[in-house]
Protein backbone atom coordinates (compact mmCIF):
# COMPACT_ATOMS: atom_id res chain seq x y z
CA UNK A 1 0.00 0.00 0.00
CA UNK A 2 1.21 3.48 -0.85
CA UNK A 3 1.97 6.01 1.85
CA UNK A 4 0.79 9.57 1.29
CA UNK A 5 2.63 12.82 1.98
CA UNK A 6 0.64 16.06 1.77
CA UNK A 7 2.53 19.34 1.32
CA UNK A 8 0.71 22.56 2.21
CA UNK A 9 1.93 26.14 2.29
CA UNK A 10 1.44 29.06 4.63
CA UNK A 11 2.05 32.80 5.09
CA UNK A 12 2.73 33.57 1.40
CA UNK A 13 2.61 31.69 -1.90
CA UNK A 14 5.57 30.87 -4.17
CA UNK A 15 7.70 29.63 -1.27
CA UNK A 16 8.85 26.54 -3.15
CA UNK A 17 6.38 23.78 -2.29
CA UNK A 18 7.00 22.27 -5.72
CA UNK A 19 10.78 22.27 -5.36
CA UNK A 20 10.52 20.94 -1.81
CA UNK A 21 8.24 18.11 -2.97
CA UNK A 22 10.54 17.32 -5.90
CA UNK A 23 13.63 17.33 -3.68
CA UNK A 24 11.99 15.03 -1.15
CA UNK A 25 10.95 12.70 -3.97
CA UNK A 26 14.54 12.44 -5.19
CA UNK A 27 15.85 11.76 -1.68
CA UNK A 28 13.29 9.00 -1.10
CA UNK A 29 14.11 7.51 -4.50
CA UNK A 30 17.80 7.56 -3.67
CA UNK A 31 16.93 5.52 -0.58
CA UNK A 32 15.37 2.84 -2.79
CA UNK A 33 11.68 3.80 -2.84
CA UNK A 34 9.23 4.38 -5.72
CA UNK A 35 7.68 7.85 -5.62
CA UNK A 36 5.00 9.69 -7.59
CA UNK A 37 4.25 13.41 -7.15
CA UNK A 38 0.88 15.07 -7.73
CA UNK A 39 -0.36 18.65 -7.77
CA UNK A 40 -3.79 19.80 -6.61
CA UNK A 41 -4.50 23.30 -7.94
CA UNK A 42 -7.33 25.31 -6.37
CA UNK A 43 -8.14 27.60 -9.32
CA UNK A 44 -11.42 27.26 -11.24
CA UNK A 45 -9.84 26.86 -14.67
CA UNK A 46 -10.12 23.30 -15.98
CA UNK A 47 -6.40 23.46 -16.80
CA UNK A 48 -3.82 26.24 -17.34
CA UNK A 49 -3.88 25.80 -21.13
CA UNK A 50 -5.76 29.02 -21.87
CA UNK A 51 -4.28 31.08 -19.03
CA UNK A 52 -1.85 33.92 -19.71
CA UNK A 53 1.79 33.10 -18.89
CA UNK A 54 1.83 36.37 -16.93
CA UNK A 55 -0.93 34.93 -14.71
CA UNK A 56 0.26 31.38 -14.33
CA UNK A 57 3.73 31.00 -15.79
CA UNK A 58 4.64 28.14 -18.08
CA UNK A 59 2.20 25.45 -19.15
CA UNK A 60 3.99 22.12 -18.78
CA UNK A 61 2.92 19.35 -21.17
CA UNK A 62 3.06 15.66 -20.28
CA UNK A 63 3.64 12.71 -22.62
CA UNK A 64 -0.06 11.84 -22.57
CA UNK A 65 -1.10 15.36 -23.57
CA UNK A 66 -2.07 17.09 -20.33
CA UNK A 67 -1.55 20.85 -20.00
CA UNK A 68 -0.41 21.18 -16.42
CA UNK A 69 1.18 23.37 -13.77
CA UNK A 70 4.88 24.19 -14.14
CA UNK A 71 5.58 22.39 -10.86
CA UNK A 72 5.15 19.10 -12.73
CA UNK A 73 8.26 20.13 -14.66
CA UNK A 74 10.17 20.33 -11.38
CA UNK A 75 8.78 16.93 -10.41
CA UNK A 76 10.03 15.34 -13.64
CA UNK A 77 13.42 17.05 -13.61
CA UNK A 78 14.21 16.06 -10.03
CA UNK A 79 12.60 12.61 -9.83
CA UNK A 80 13.18 11.45 -13.40
CA UNK A 81 9.61 10.08 -13.47
CA UNK A 82 7.41 11.23 -16.35
CA UNK A 83 4.18 12.82 -15.14
CA UNK A 84 0.72 11.80 -16.34
CA UNK A 85 -2.66 13.49 -16.79
CA UNK A 86 -3.66 11.90 -13.51
CA UNK A 87 -0.93 13.80 -11.64
CA UNK A 88 -2.55 17.25 -11.87
CA UNK A 89 -6.08 18.25 -10.93
CA UNK A 90 -7.81 21.62 -10.59
CA UNK A 91 -10.96 22.83 -8.87
CA UNK A 92 -12.37 23.49 -12.34
CA UNK A 93 -11.77 19.89 -13.40
CA UNK A 94 -13.24 18.53 -10.15
CA UNK A 95 -16.39 20.64 -10.45
CA UNK A 96 -16.76 19.78 -14.15
CA UNK A 97 -16.62 16.06 -13.35
CA UNK A 98 -19.11 16.34 -10.50
CA UNK A 99 -21.56 18.50 -12.47
CA UNK A 100 -21.35 16.15 -15.46
CA UNK A 101 -22.30 13.25 -13.20
CA UNK A 102 -25.14 15.30 -11.71
CA UNK A 103 -26.54 16.01 -15.18
CA UNK A 104 -26.41 12.29 -15.99
CA UNK A 105 -28.35 11.52 -12.82
CA UNK A 106 -25.55 9.51 -11.25
CA UNK A 107 -26.24 11.01 -7.81
CA UNK A 108 -29.80 9.65 -7.88
CA UNK A 109 -31.49 12.94 -7.08
CA UNK A 110 -29.35 13.79 -4.06
CA UNK A 111 -28.38 17.38 -3.23
CA UNK A 112 -24.87 17.82 -4.64
CA UNK A 113 -22.60 19.47 -2.06
CA UNK A 114 -18.94 20.31 -1.47
CA UNK A 115 -18.96 17.66 1.27
CA UNK A 116 -19.16 14.83 0.35
CA UNK A 117 -19.30 15.05 -3.46
CA UNK A 118 -16.43 17.46 -4.20
CA UNK A 119 -14.20 16.11 -1.43
CA UNK A 120 -14.89 12.51 -2.46
CA UNK A 121 -13.84 13.29 -6.04
CA UNK A 122 -10.61 14.89 -4.76
CA UNK A 123 -9.89 11.79 -2.66
CA UNK A 124 -10.47 9.57 -5.69
CA UNK A 125 -7.91 11.63 -7.62
CA UNK A 126 -5.33 11.31 -4.84
CA UNK A 127 -5.69 7.53 -4.66
CA UNK A 128 -6.05 6.81 -8.40
CA UNK A 129 -3.28 4.73 -9.99
CA UNK A 130 -1.11 4.77 -6.87
CA UNK A 131 -1.11 1.12 -5.80
CA UNK A 132 2.36 0.42 -7.25
CA UNK A 133 4.00 3.40 -5.53
CA UNK A 134 5.76 3.38 -2.17
CA UNK A 135 5.04 7.09 -1.68
CA UNK A 136 2.62 9.55 -3.26
CA UNK A 137 3.52 13.18 -2.58
CA UNK A 138 0.60 15.59 -3.07
CA UNK A 139 1.28 19.31 -3.22
CA UNK A 140 -1.70 21.56 -2.45
CA UNK A 141 -1.55 24.81 -4.44
CA UNK A 142 -2.00 28.20 -2.78
CA UNK A 143 -1.79 28.71 0.97
CA UNK A 144 -3.79 27.58 3.97
CA UNK A 145 -6.59 30.06 4.58
CA UNK A 146 -7.41 30.68 0.92
CA UNK A 147 -11.12 30.20 0.26
CA UNK A 148 -10.30 28.31 -2.94
CA UNK A 149 -8.17 25.69 -1.17
CA UNK A 150 -10.66 24.77 1.57
CA UNK A 151 -12.21 21.76 -0.26
CA UNK A 152 -8.73 20.33 -0.89
CA UNK A 153 -7.60 20.80 2.71
CA UNK A 154 -10.81 19.19 3.96
CA UNK A 155 -10.35 16.33 1.48
CA UNK A 156 -6.81 15.54 2.64
CA UNK A 157 -7.97 15.69 6.28
CA UNK A 158 -10.63 13.10 5.48
CA UNK A 159 -8.19 11.07 3.39
CA UNK A 160 -5.75 10.74 6.30
CA UNK A 161 -8.58 9.35 8.42
CA UNK A 162 -9.62 6.97 5.62
CA UNK A 163 -6.17 5.41 5.12
CA UNK A 164 -5.11 5.73 8.75
CA UNK A 165 -2.76 8.32 10.22
CA UNK A 166 0.12 5.85 10.06
CA UNK A 167 -0.14 5.99 6.26
CA UNK A 168 -0.44 9.78 5.85
CA UNK A 169 2.03 12.54 6.68
CA UNK A 170 1.43 16.30 6.64
CA UNK A 171 4.26 18.70 5.76
CA UNK A 172 3.65 22.43 6.12
CA UNK A 173 5.98 24.89 4.38
CA UNK A 174 6.03 28.41 5.82
CA UNK A 175 7.98 31.63 5.63
CA UNK A 176 10.16 32.65 8.56
CA UNK A 177 10.94 36.26 7.60
CA UNK A 178 14.04 38.22 8.49
CA UNK A 179 13.46 41.88 9.40
CA UNK A 180 16.48 43.91 8.38
CA UNK A 181 15.50 46.98 10.41
CA UNK A 182 15.52 45.10 13.72
CA UNK A 183 17.94 42.36 12.62
CA UNK A 184 15.46 39.71 13.77
CA UNK A 185 13.98 36.47 12.49
CA UNK A 186 10.24 36.23 13.20
CA UNK A 187 8.41 32.98 13.95
CA UNK A 188 4.97 34.49 14.58
CA UNK A 189 3.75 34.14 10.93
CA UNK A 190 4.57 30.42 11.08
CA UNK A 191 2.73 30.04 14.39
CA UNK A 192 -0.38 31.71 12.97
CA UNK A 193 -0.22 29.66 9.77
CA UNK A 194 -0.09 26.41 11.73
CA UNK A 195 -2.91 27.68 13.95
CA UNK A 196 -4.99 28.21 10.80
CA UNK A 197 -4.17 24.70 9.58
CA UNK A 198 -5.05 23.16 12.95
CA UNK A 199 -8.37 25.01 12.99
CA UNK A 200 -9.30 23.06 9.86
CA UNK A 201 -8.42 19.80 11.58
CA UNK A 202 -4.86 19.14 10.41
CA UNK A 203 -1.85 18.94 12.70
CA UNK A 204 1.37 19.16 10.65
CA UNK A 205 3.90 16.42 11.33
CA UNK A 206 6.82 18.28 9.76
CA UNK A 207 7.28 22.04 9.34
CA UNK A 208 9.68 23.30 6.67
CA UNK A 209 10.79 26.84 7.47
CA UNK A 210 11.87 28.91 4.48
CA UNK A 211 14.19 31.77 5.39
CA UNK A 212 16.85 33.92 3.81
CA UNK A 213 19.08 33.38 6.87
CA UNK A 214 19.88 30.38 9.09
CA UNK A 215 17.29 29.97 11.85
CA UNK A 216 18.81 29.91 15.38
CA UNK A 217 18.11 26.85 17.53
CA UNK A 218 16.10 28.93 20.02
CA UNK A 219 13.72 29.98 17.25
CA UNK A 220 13.33 26.40 16.08
CA UNK A 221 12.52 25.35 19.64
CA UNK A 222 9.93 28.11 19.78
CA UNK A 223 8.29 26.85 16.57
CA UNK A 224 8.40 23.31 17.97
CA UNK A 225 6.71 24.40 21.22
CA UNK A 226 3.95 26.58 19.79
CA UNK A 227 3.20 24.38 16.78
CA UNK A 228 3.29 21.08 18.66
CA UNK A 229 5.93 19.53 16.39
CA UNK A 230 9.04 17.58 17.43
CA UNK A 231 12.17 19.75 17.21
CA UNK A 232 13.71 17.20 14.81
CA UNK A 233 10.80 17.82 12.45
CA UNK A 234 11.33 21.58 12.29
CA UNK A 235 13.30 21.66 9.05
CA UNK A 236 15.24 24.71 7.94
CA UNK A 237 15.59 25.61 4.25
CA UNK A 238 17.72 28.68 3.62
CA UNK A 239 17.74 30.38 0.21
CA UNK A 240 20.15 28.58 -2.12
CA UNK A 241 22.20 29.90 -5.03
CA UNK A 242 20.70 27.44 -7.51
CA UNK A 243 17.62 25.23 -7.20
CA UNK A 244 19.82 22.18 -7.72
CA UNK A 245 21.28 22.73 -4.26
CA UNK A 246 17.84 22.10 -2.72
CA UNK A 247 18.11 18.28 -2.47
CA UNK A 248 21.45 18.64 -0.68
CA UNK A 249 19.98 21.24 1.68
CA UNK A 250 17.13 18.92 2.68
CA UNK A 251 19.53 15.96 2.92
CA UNK A 252 21.65 17.93 5.38
CA UNK A 253 18.51 18.60 7.45
CA UNK A 254 17.63 14.86 7.31
CA UNK A 255 14.16 15.51 5.89
CA UNK A 256 14.07 12.14 4.13
CA UNK A 257 15.10 10.26 7.28
CA UNK A 258 12.45 12.03 9.35
CA UNK A 259 9.83 11.00 6.78
CA UNK A 260 11.01 7.37 6.90
CA UNK A 261 11.05 7.45 10.72
CA UNK A 262 7.46 8.68 10.76
CA UNK A 263 6.36 5.72 8.63
CA UNK A 264 8.61 3.35 10.63
CA UNK A 265 10.62 2.51 7.52
CA UNK A 266 14.34 2.09 6.95
CA UNK A 267 16.52 3.21 4.08
CA UNK A 268 16.91 0.43 1.50
CA UNK A 269 20.26 1.83 0.37
CA UNK A 270 22.53 4.82 1.11
CA UNK A 271 21.46 8.09 -0.51
CA UNK A 272 23.76 9.30 -3.29
CA UNK A 273 24.01 13.08 -3.65
CA UNK A 274 27.21 13.08 -5.71
CA UNK A 275 25.45 13.78 -9.05
CA UNK A 276 23.86 16.91 -7.56
CA UNK A 277 27.16 18.05 -6.07
CA UNK A 278 28.77 17.68 -9.48
CA UNK A 279 26.19 19.72 -11.39
CA UNK A 280 25.98 22.51 -8.80
CA UNK A 281 29.76 22.82 -8.90
CA UNK A 282 29.61 23.29 -12.69
CA UNK A 283 26.79 25.84 -12.41
CA UNK A 284 28.35 27.89 -9.63
CA UNK A 285 32.08 27.71 -10.25
CA UNK A 286 32.61 27.39 -14.00
CA UNK A 287 34.59 30.30 -15.40
CA UNK A 288 33.69 29.57 -19.03
CA UNK A 289 30.47 31.33 -20.02
CA UNK A 290 28.17 31.74 -23.03
CA UNK A 291 25.48 34.36 -23.57
CA UNK A 292 22.19 33.07 -24.98
CA UNK A 293 19.46 35.50 -26.06
CA UNK A 294 15.88 34.41 -25.45
CA UNK A 295 13.66 36.61 -27.60
CA UNK A 296 9.99 36.37 -26.67
CA UNK A 297 7.02 38.38 -25.47
CA UNK A 298 6.78 36.90 -21.95
CA UNK A 299 10.39 37.50 -20.87
CA UNK A 300 9.37 39.83 -18.02
CA UNK A 301 8.17 36.80 -16.07
CA UNK A 302 10.88 34.16 -15.60
CA UNK A 303 8.37 31.40 -14.90
CA UNK A 304 6.89 31.83 -18.41
CA UNK A 305 9.84 29.90 -19.87
CA UNK A 306 10.80 27.86 -16.81
CA UNK A 307 11.52 24.53 -18.51
CA UNK A 308 13.41 26.32 -21.28
CA UNK A 309 15.64 28.14 -18.79
CA UNK A 310 16.39 24.87 -17.03
CA UNK A 311 17.05 22.98 -20.28
CA UNK A 312 19.61 25.60 -21.31
CA UNK A 313 21.24 25.25 -17.90
CA UNK A 314 21.36 21.48 -18.46
CA UNK A 315 23.04 22.07 -21.83
CA UNK A 316 25.61 24.19 -20.00
CA UNK A 317 26.18 21.44 -17.44
CA UNK A 318 26.84 18.94 -20.23
CA UNK A 319 29.37 21.32 -21.82
CA UNK A 320 30.87 22.45 -18.50
CA UNK A 321 30.01 26.06 -19.19
CA UNK A 322 27.85 28.62 -17.40
CA UNK A 323 24.89 29.82 -19.47
CA UNK A 324 23.95 33.49 -19.10
CA UNK A 325 20.41 34.13 -20.28
CA UNK A 326 19.79 37.51 -21.91
CA UNK A 327 16.04 38.14 -22.06
CA UNK A 328 14.86 40.40 -24.86
CA UNK A 329 11.24 41.53 -25.23
CA UNK A 330 10.33 40.91 -28.87
CA UNK A 331 7.60 43.58 -28.76
CA UNK A 332 10.13 46.26 -27.83
CA UNK A 333 12.92 45.04 -30.13
CA UNK A 334 13.51 47.61 -32.85
CA UNK A 335 15.21 46.71 -36.13
CA UNK A 336 17.73 49.51 -35.64
CA UNK A 337 18.74 48.06 -32.24
CA UNK A 338 19.14 44.40 -33.18
CA UNK A 339 22.84 44.53 -34.04
CA UNK A 340 23.63 46.38 -30.80
CA UNK A 341 21.50 44.17 -28.53
CA UNK A 342 22.87 40.95 -30.03
CA UNK A 343 26.49 42.10 -30.14
CA UNK A 344 27.91 39.75 -27.48
CA UNK A 345 25.42 36.94 -28.01
CA UNK A 346 26.70 33.44 -28.83
CA UNK A 347 23.30 31.86 -29.51
CA UNK A 348 19.77 33.04 -30.29
CA UNK A 349 16.64 31.20 -29.20
CA UNK A 350 13.04 31.98 -30.16
CA UNK A 351 10.67 30.09 -27.82
CA UNK A 352 7.07 29.00 -28.26
CA UNK A 353 4.25 31.52 -28.19
CA UNK A 354 0.93 32.56 -29.63
CA UNK A 355 -0.52 35.54 -31.52
CA UNK A 356 0.82 38.42 -33.60
CA UNK A 357 2.42 40.55 -30.88
CA UNK A 358 6.19 40.65 -31.16
CA UNK A 359 6.44 38.75 -34.46
CA UNK A 360 8.36 41.48 -36.30
CA UNK A 361 11.11 41.54 -33.68
CA UNK A 362 11.42 37.76 -33.76
CA UNK A 363 11.62 37.59 -37.56
CA UNK A 364 14.33 40.26 -37.69
CA UNK A 365 16.34 38.50 -34.98
CA UNK A 366 16.12 35.25 -36.96
CA UNK A 367 17.35 37.04 -40.07
CA UNK A 368 20.29 38.39 -38.05
CA UNK A 369 21.14 34.86 -36.84
CA UNK A 370 20.90 33.42 -40.35
CA UNK A 371 23.04 36.08 -42.05
CA UNK A 372 25.67 36.28 -39.31
CA UNK A 373 26.03 32.52 -38.80
CA UNK A 374 25.00 32.75 -35.13
CA UNK A 375 23.73 29.45 -33.65
CA UNK A 376 19.93 29.56 -33.70
CA UNK A 377 17.24 27.38 -32.13
CA UNK A 378 13.57 27.98 -32.90
CA UNK A 379 11.04 26.12 -30.78
CA UNK A 380 7.42 25.63 -31.93
CA UNK A 381 6.37 29.20 -32.81
CA UNK A 382 10.08 29.99 -33.18
CA UNK A 383 10.41 27.42 -35.95
CA UNK A 384 7.34 28.85 -37.69
CA UNK A 385 8.84 32.35 -37.58
CA UNK A 386 12.07 30.95 -39.09
CA UNK A 387 10.02 29.45 -41.93
CA UNK A 388 8.29 32.78 -42.59
CA UNK A 389 11.58 34.72 -42.50
CA UNK A 390 13.18 32.33 -44.99
CA UNK A 391 10.14 32.34 -47.28
CA UNK A 392 10.05 36.13 -47.42
CA UNK A 393 13.76 36.77 -47.83
CA UNK A 394 15.03 33.69 -49.68
CA UNK A 395 12.02 32.41 -51.62
CA UNK A 396 10.82 35.94 -52.38
CA UNK A 397 7.34 35.12 -51.07
CA UNK A 398 6.81 38.55 -49.56
CA UNK A 399 3.26 37.80 -48.41
CA UNK A 400 4.25 34.55 -46.67
CA UNK A 401 2.60 34.47 -43.27
CA UNK A 402 0.68 32.44 -40.71
CA UNK A 403 -3.09 32.30 -40.67
CA UNK A 404 -2.80 32.64 -36.90
CA UNK A 405 -2.30 36.38 -37.26
CA UNK A 406 -2.92 37.18 -40.95
CA UNK A 407 -5.87 35.75 -42.87
CA UNK A 408 -5.03 37.53 -46.15
CA UNK A 409 -1.46 36.47 -46.90
CA UNK A 410 0.02 33.22 -48.22
CA UNK A 411 -0.50 30.61 -45.47
CA UNK A 412 2.93 29.01 -45.15
CA UNK A 413 1.75 28.28 -41.60
CA UNK A 414 -1.86 27.35 -40.86
CA UNK A 415 -4.25 25.09 -39.04
CA UNK A 416 -3.99 21.61 -40.48
CA UNK A 417 -7.61 21.88 -41.66
CA UNK A 418 -7.03 25.27 -43.30
CA UNK A 419 -4.91 24.10 -46.21
CA UNK A 420 -4.86 21.26 -48.68
CA UNK A 421 -2.06 19.62 -50.62
CA UNK A 422 -1.90 22.42 -53.19
CA UNK A 423 -1.55 25.04 -50.47
CA UNK A 424 -4.95 26.63 -51.05
CA UNK A 425 -6.92 27.79 -48.05
CA UNK A 426 -10.04 25.97 -46.97
CA UNK A 427 -12.45 26.95 -44.25
CA UNK A 428 -11.60 25.70 -40.75
CA UNK A 429 -14.01 24.92 -37.95
CA UNK A 430 -14.52 26.89 -34.77
CA UNK A 431 -13.80 25.02 -31.54
CA UNK A 432 -13.06 25.85 -27.93
CA UNK A 433 -9.46 27.02 -27.55
CA UNK A 434 -8.77 24.22 -25.12
CA UNK A 435 -9.83 21.54 -27.60
CA UNK A 436 -7.92 22.39 -30.78
CA UNK A 437 -4.33 21.70 -29.76
CA UNK A 438 -1.93 19.05 -30.90
CA UNK A 439 -0.85 17.93 -27.46
CA UNK A 440 1.45 15.33 -26.00
CA UNK A 441 4.12 13.01 -27.33
CA UNK A 442 4.37 12.25 -31.07
CA UNK A 443 6.87 10.36 -33.21
CA UNK A 444 9.06 12.03 -35.81
CA UNK A 445 11.37 10.36 -38.29
CA UNK A 446 14.72 12.00 -39.03
CA UNK A 447 16.46 12.39 -42.37
CA UNK A 448 19.58 10.28 -42.83
CA UNK A 449 22.89 12.14 -42.45
CA UNK A 450 21.11 15.31 -41.32
CA UNK A 451 22.48 17.45 -38.50
CA UNK A 452 19.49 16.58 -36.35
CA UNK A 453 19.95 12.81 -36.81
CA UNK A 454 23.57 13.15 -35.69
CA UNK A 455 22.46 15.12 -32.62
CA UNK A 456 19.84 12.56 -31.60
CA UNK A 457 21.85 9.56 -32.86
CA UNK A 458 18.56 8.02 -33.91
CA UNK A 459 16.24 7.71 -36.90
CA UNK A 460 13.03 7.95 -34.89
CA UNK A 461 12.34 10.26 -31.95
CA UNK A 462 9.40 11.00 -29.68
CA UNK A 463 8.82 14.57 -28.46
CA UNK A 464 6.06 16.60 -26.80
CA UNK A 465 3.93 19.06 -28.75
CA UNK A 466 1.70 21.99 -27.85
CA UNK A 467 0.43 23.93 -30.87
CA UNK A 468 -2.51 24.46 -33.20
CA UNK A 469 -0.66 25.57 -36.32
CA UNK A 470 1.55 23.55 -38.67
CA UNK A 471 4.00 24.24 -41.50
CA UNK A 472 2.38 23.59 -44.88
CA UNK A 473 4.13 20.55 -46.39
CA UNK A 474 3.20 21.72 -49.91
CA UNK A 475 6.11 24.20 -49.83
CA UNK A 476 8.74 21.63 -48.83
CA UNK A 477 10.47 21.34 -52.23
CA UNK A 478 10.76 25.12 -52.65
CA UNK A 479 12.44 25.47 -49.27
CA UNK A 480 14.85 22.60 -49.81
CA UNK A 481 16.00 23.94 -53.19
CA UNK A 482 17.12 27.10 -51.38
CA UNK A 483 18.93 25.24 -48.61
CA UNK A 484 16.36 24.87 -45.81
CA UNK A 485 16.07 21.13 -45.21
CA UNK A 486 12.96 19.54 -43.72
CA UNK A 487 15.02 17.05 -41.72
CA UNK A 488 12.23 15.72 -39.51
CA UNK A 489 8.73 14.68 -40.56
CA UNK A 490 5.76 12.96 -38.98
CA UNK A 491 5.68 9.21 -39.77
CA UNK A 492 3.05 9.80 -42.49
CA UNK A 493 5.23 12.50 -44.15
CA UNK A 494 2.46 15.10 -43.84
CA UNK A 495 3.75 17.32 -41.04
CA UNK A 496 7.18 19.02 -40.96
CA UNK A 497 8.63 18.64 -37.46
CA UNK A 498 12.23 19.86 -37.88
CA UNK A 499 14.04 22.25 -40.22
CA UNK A 500 17.73 23.02 -40.54
CA UNK A 501 19.86 25.25 -42.77
CA UNK A 502 22.34 23.54 -45.04
CA UNK A 503 24.94 26.32 -45.18
CA UNK A 504 24.92 27.41 -41.56
CA UNK A 505 27.02 26.19 -38.59
CA UNK A 506 23.94 25.54 -36.41
CA UNK A 507 20.44 26.68 -37.42
CA UNK A 508 17.61 24.37 -36.31
CA UNK A 509 13.89 24.79 -35.80
CA UNK A 510 11.64 22.22 -34.13
CA UNK A 511 7.84 22.13 -34.01
CA UNK A 512 7.88 20.40 -30.62
CA UNK A 513 9.05 21.40 -27.13
CA UNK A 514 12.29 19.53 -26.32
CA UNK A 515 12.69 21.51 -23.08
CA UNK A 516 9.96 19.42 -21.43
CA UNK A 517 12.14 16.29 -21.59
CA UNK A 518 15.44 17.74 -20.42
CA UNK A 519 16.69 16.87 -16.94
CA UNK A 520 19.75 18.01 -14.98
CA UNK A 521 21.10 14.47 -14.72
CA UNK A 522 20.13 13.70 -18.36
CA UNK A 523 20.40 16.88 -20.51
CA UNK A 524 18.42 16.90 -23.76
CA UNK A 525 20.78 16.32 -26.74
CA UNK A 526 19.34 19.28 -28.67
CA UNK A 527 20.23 21.75 -25.90
CA UNK A 528 23.61 20.14 -25.34
CA UNK A 529 24.39 20.54 -29.05
CA UNK A 530 23.04 24.12 -29.14
CA UNK A 531 25.17 25.21 -26.19
CA UNK A 532 28.19 23.45 -27.69
CA UNK A 533 27.69 25.41 -30.93
CA UNK A 534 27.30 28.64 -28.95
CA UNK A 535 30.45 27.83 -26.99
CA UNK A 536 32.39 27.41 -30.25
CA UNK A 537 30.90 30.50 -31.91
CA UNK A 538 33.29 33.39 -32.48
From Swiss-Prot:
Keyword Nucleotide-binding carried by entry: yes
The protein's enzyme class: ligase
Control of this protein's activity: Allosterically activated by GTP, when glutamine is the substrate; GTP has no effect on the reaction when ammonia is the substrate. The allosteric effector GTP functions by stabilizing the protein conformation that binds the tetrahedral intermediate(s) formed during glutamine hydrolysis. Inhibited by the product CTP, via allosteric rather than competitive inhibition.
InterPro entries: Class_I_gatase-like (IPR029062), CTP_synthase (IPR004468), CTP_synthase_N (IPR017456), GATASE (IPR017926), GATase1_CTP_Synthase (IPR033828), P-loop_NTPase (IPR027417)
CDD domains xref list: CTPS_N, GATase1_CTP_Synthase
Residue intervals of the Glutamine amidotransferase type-1 domain: 291-538
Binding positions for CTP per the UniProt entry: 13, 146-148, 186-191, 222
Binding-site residues for ATP, renumbered to this chain: 14-19, 71
Active site (catalytic residues): 380, 513, 515
Function field: Catalyzes the ATP-dependent amination of UTP to CTP with either L-glutamine or ammonia as the source of nitrogen. Regulates intracellular CTP levels through interactions with the four ribonucleotide triphosphates.
Other facts noted in the record for this chain: CTPSs have evolved a hybrid strategy for distinguishing between UTP and CTP. The overlapping regions of the product feedback inhibitory and substrate sites recognize a common feature in both compounds, the triphosphate moiety. To differentiate isosteric substrate and product pyrimidine rings, an additional pocket far from the expected kinase/ligase catalytic site, specifically recognizes the cytosine and ribose portions of the product inhibitor.
Subunit structure: Homotetramer.
Family as reported in the entry's similarity comment: Belongs to the CTP synthase family.
Protein name from the UniProt record: CTP synthase
Gene assigned in the entry: pyrG
